[in-house]
């Protein structure tokens, strides 16, 4: 028996759960379902990250479900602080009123980069700007619409390739990627593109 199998059999290899899960209280997928049941026509944005290596670069992806519109923010690091800081320019681009209308809910996964729920939910003056909910563990189907767009991103930036060697090195390149994706006609938009 190999040493690895022996260690597993003897219980040496244990998965360590993240200790602090307080950010999930009131923000689980079950809470998301309850919230959307109680609030008709709520605008939902799905959020995730796409990357090929732990050294980056990283793409923080946002999908506006009402419009099938995707937006990418370029990052050099994948930290909770970086993810929170990217919501500010999104709010700035849309303007406060439009942001409050179109980004009522952000649905994301439980990645450590999204663990600062309060930072994502509140703007710089501490007022609520959105509600964050987390998909169940290992349930990418809970944000399947965005995952489908990730397939389009992977067509441009295949897995296991160095993104910087491909030329993905700036927000300008991220904008070019989403320009291509948002220009494609979508069946759910009756043959129109998200930009139309």
Pin down the residues of each PLM region:
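Mobile-element integrase/transposase regions
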Residues: 2-59
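Active-site microenvironment for binding and transforming phosphate-containing groups
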Residues: 42-43, 119, 123
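Mobile genetic element proteins and their domesticated derivatives, centered on retroelements
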Residues: 48, 62, 68, 87, ...
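Acidic/histidine-rich, metal-coordinating catalytic segments
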Residues: 48, 99-116, 136-138
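Active-site beta-loop-alpha junctions of metal-dependent nucleic acid enzymes
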Residues: 52-55, 72-97
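Coil-to-beta-strand transition motifs
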Residues: 55-57, 65-70
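Short, surface-exposed connector motifs at secondary-structure boundaries
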Residues: 67-71, 97-104, 159-160
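Charged alpha-helix within mobile-element recombinases
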Residues: 122-125, 129-196
């Amino acid at each position: 028996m190999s040493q690895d199998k022996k260690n597993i059999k003897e219980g040496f290899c244990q998965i360590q759960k993240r200790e602090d899960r307080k950010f999930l209280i009131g923000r689980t997928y079950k809470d998301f379902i309850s919230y959307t049941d109680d609030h008709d026509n709520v605008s939902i944005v799905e959020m995730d990250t796409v990357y090929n290596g732990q050294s980056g670069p990283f793409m923080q992806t946002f999908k506006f479900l009402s419009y099938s519109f995707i937006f990418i923010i370029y990052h050099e690091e994948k930290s909770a602080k970086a993810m929170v800081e990217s919501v500010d320019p999104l709010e700035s681009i849309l303007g406060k009123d439009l942001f409050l209308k179109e980004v009522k809910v952000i649905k994301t996964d439980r990645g450590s980069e999204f663990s600062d729920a309060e930072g994502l939910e509140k703007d710089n003056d501490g007022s609520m700007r959105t509600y964050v909910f987390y998909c169940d563990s290992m349930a990418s189907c809970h944000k399947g619409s965005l995952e489908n767009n990730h397939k389009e991103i992977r067509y441009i930036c295949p897995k296991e390739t160095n993104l910087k060697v491909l030329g993905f090195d700036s927000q300008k390149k991220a904008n070019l990627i989403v320009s291509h994706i948002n220009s494609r006609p979508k069946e759910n938009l009756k043959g129109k593109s998200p930009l139309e």
